[in-house]
């Protein structure tokens, strides 16, 4: 018997798998990677040796204002480590520069004051100037061009009306943008809902290039790079993290060159070969990424990449915030026929995209090919409304999976475990 401690919210759940049924365990090399220095030193070294760019302190000279785009509460970016160093570097080059920290909420809810304190520490949260991006406020946006896909590129004016635009973030596999970080700080981070909807259209989500670990030929990535370049994002500081959300590498400098270097590092660690199985058990990496069902679809796609068609995906995710998107939830709840719901989404043109359509589309893709069981703190009715199976604990989920397979004539189905679904690129 093999035992696994799987991240679940701010704690863990225990999975036991018989030796003769275990097909494989897919784990990112980042989890065992031994960094060359402590977290702060890694970030310091990256800022001192930027890739394809002068130092940030040099860029700050002669500038009156600077906006730093920073990830929101749903992302495990160690801002308490990165942000003080960005502020110090900027003020070393220009003590009088006026700095605004713009929270890149994308299409998420707004970050609370308590969440800002938890993320940055009390000193920064209470003394620096913060602006919360709201993608639905048209009056906050300014048009800066047309995306390669044809959509209007509207970005928060706080990011545009500044002398120097900087971003912090982290690099991990992303289920349709290829990887997070870099250009994503602008789109979707601080872009208008109109621009996000155009970029996240069903046509692009349906592309074989809009998948985890793929940047080349990815239409979503192409739009994002355009938005970041056109917004004049001058400097980024991105980190890679391990399972404990600790920094293991840092990359600073030009938005594309630094990001590409970080992606190459991450890919070496995150790329794992598929181990096809009847049952795949995964998570969304625990808090903060498993706060809702919406975010948990990311981890499910890692399971999808190694689950046999018609198999069972078990997702262990706290979902303490519930579904995470009203439109996302309602699309699934109101779907009497899953294929009809998918066809309706695919029929929408780029300018007809609705809120959270992309997440609905990906979850529908999963549900049309697999049975999905959620081990979660979310209400059972919510899970069942969304056409998934609810299990109160992982043992019940495993028994349920065996029953689903037995009804298909499969006994003692094989099991692959992906302890952190958002950290791997399954190939």
What are these regions, as identified by a protein language model?
Residues 126-273:
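Conserved, well-structured core segments that form the ligand-binding/active-site neighborhood
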Residues 65-76, 100-106, 281-283, 314:
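Short glycine-rich or small-residue beta-strand-to-loop segments that form or flank ligand, phosphate
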Residues 75-96, 101, 296-306:
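Histidine-anchored nucleotide/phosphate-binding helix
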Residues 71-83, 105-110, 170-174, 285-289, ...:
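Gly/Ser/Thr-rich loops at beta-strand to alpha-helix junctions
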Residues 1-46:
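N-terminal amphipathic/basic leader segments beginning at the initiator methionine
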Residues 51-67, 91-97, 271-279, 306-308, ...:
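Glycine-rich phosphate/diphosphate-binding loops that line cofactor/substrate pockets in enzymes
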Residues 116-141, 340-350:
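A glycine-rich helix N-cap at a beta->alpha junction
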Residues 296-297, 301-427:
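C-terminal non-catalytic interaction/assembly regions of soluble proteins
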């Amino acid at each position: 018997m093999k035992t696994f401690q799987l991240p679940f919210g701010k704690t863990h759940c225990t999975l036991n798998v018989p030796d003769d049924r275990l097909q494989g365990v897919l784990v990112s090399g980042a989890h065992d990677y031994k960094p060359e220095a402590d977290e702060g030193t890694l970030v310091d070294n990256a800022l001192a040796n930027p890739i394809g760019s002068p130092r940030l302190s040099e860029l700050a000279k002669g500038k009156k204002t600077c906006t730093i785009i920073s990830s929101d509460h749903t992302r495990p970016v160690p801002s308490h480590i990165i942000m003080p160093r960005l502020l110090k570097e900027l003020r070393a080059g220009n003590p009088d520069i006026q700095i605004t920290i713009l929270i890149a909420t994308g299409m998420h809810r707004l970050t609370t004051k308590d969440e800002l304190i938890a993320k940055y520490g009390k000193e920064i949260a209470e003394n620096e100037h913060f602006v919360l991006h709201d993608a639905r406020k048209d009056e906050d946006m300014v048009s800066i061009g047309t995306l390669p896909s044809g959509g209007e590129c509207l970005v928060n004016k706080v990011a545009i009306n500044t002398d120097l635009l900087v971003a912090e973030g982290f690099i991990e596999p992303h289920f349709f943008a290829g990887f997070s970080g870099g250009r994503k700080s602008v789109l979707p981070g601080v872009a208008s809902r109109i621009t996000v909807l155009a970029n996240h259209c069903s046509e692009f989500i349906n592309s074989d290039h809009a998948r985890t670990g793929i940047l080349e030929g990815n239409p979503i990535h192409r739009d994002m790079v355009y938005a970041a370049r056109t917004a004049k994002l001058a400097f980024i500081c991105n980190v890679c993290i391990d399972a404990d959300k600790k920094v293991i590498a840092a990359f600073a400098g030009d938005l594309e060159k630094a990001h590409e270097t970080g992606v190459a590092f991450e890919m070496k660690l995150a790329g794992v070969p598929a181990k096809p199985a009847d049952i795949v058990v995964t998570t969304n990496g625990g808090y903060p990424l498993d706060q809702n069902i919406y975010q948990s679809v990311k981890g499910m796609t890692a399971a999808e990449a190694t689950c046999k068609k018609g198999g069972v995906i078990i997702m262990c995710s706290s979902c303490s915030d519930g579904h995470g998107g009203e439109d996302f939830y309602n699309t699934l709840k109101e779907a009497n026929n899953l294929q009809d719901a998918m066809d309706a989404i695919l029929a929408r043109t780029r300018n007809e995209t609705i809120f959270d359509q992309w997440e609905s589309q990906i979850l529908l893709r999963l549900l049309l090919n697999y049975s999905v069981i959620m081990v979660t703190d979310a209400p059972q009715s919510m899970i069942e409304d969304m056409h998934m199976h609810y299990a109160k604990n992982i043992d019940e989920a495993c028994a349920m999976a065996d029953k689903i397979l037995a009804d298909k004539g499969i006994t003692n189905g094989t099991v692959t475990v992906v302890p952190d679904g958002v950290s791997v690129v399954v190939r």
